[in-house]
């Protein structure tokens, strides 16, 4: 797996790694693209561990990080052999297939809902609305 690193790895990358005892068997990377968009990349599982659900666990861990950090959308640039895997995790294809490093690829996207933040905002609006209603009622009736 050490051949899966590049210049971005020192400063902009967050990793998820699944271990079997002391051996890393699946990994993936998170890269922030903008303040609201990020990309998952280099999600890989060793051949002997494929089909065990480790790739899904890595992806879900990175999605949790994405949500917690306030990002709205995730993209993945996937080889065609992994497209169905990502579709099963809720990703949707966009754009045309393209050739990259000798492999045909497809871009996929997933909206990451920020329930916690939306709920906090909704609660704040309800509280402010309630206080404003009480204020208006009291000033009108006094």
Swiss-Prot record:
GO molecular function: acyltransferase activity, transferring groups other than amino-acyl groups
Membrane spanning residue stretches: none
Superkingdom of the source species: Bacteria
EC class: transferase
E.C. number: 2.3.1.-
Entry annotated with the keyword Transferase: yes
Coiled-coil portions: none
InterPro entries, sorted: Acyl_CoA_acyltransferase, GNAT_dom
Domain N-acetyltransferase residue range list: 1-120
Annotated Pfam families: Acetyltransf_10
Keywords: Acyltransferase, Transferase
Family: Belongs to the acetyltransferase family.
Protein name: Uncharacterized acetyltransferase spyM18_1563
Native organism: Streptococcus pyogenes serotype M18 (strain MGAS8232)
Species classification: Bacteria, Bacillati, Bacillota, Bacilli, Lactobacillales
């Amino acid at each position: 797996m050490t051949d899966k690193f590049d210049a971005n790895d020192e400063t902009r990358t967050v990793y998820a790694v699944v271990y079997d005892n002391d051996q890393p068997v699946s990994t993936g990377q998170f890269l922030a693209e903008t303040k609201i968009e990020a990309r998952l990349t280099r999600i890989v599982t060793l051949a002997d561990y494929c089909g065990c659900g480790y790739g899904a666990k890595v992806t879900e861990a990175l999605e949790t990080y994405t949500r917690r950090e306030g990002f709205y959308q995730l993209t993945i640039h996937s080889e065609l052999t992994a497209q169905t895997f990502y579709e099963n995790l809720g990703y949707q294809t966009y754009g045309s297939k393209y050739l990259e490093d000798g492999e045909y690829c497809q871009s996929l996207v997933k909206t990451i809902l920020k329930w916690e933040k939306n709920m906090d905002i909704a609660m704040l609006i309800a509280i402010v609305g309630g206080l404003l209603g009480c204020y208006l009622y009291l000033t009108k009736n006094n």
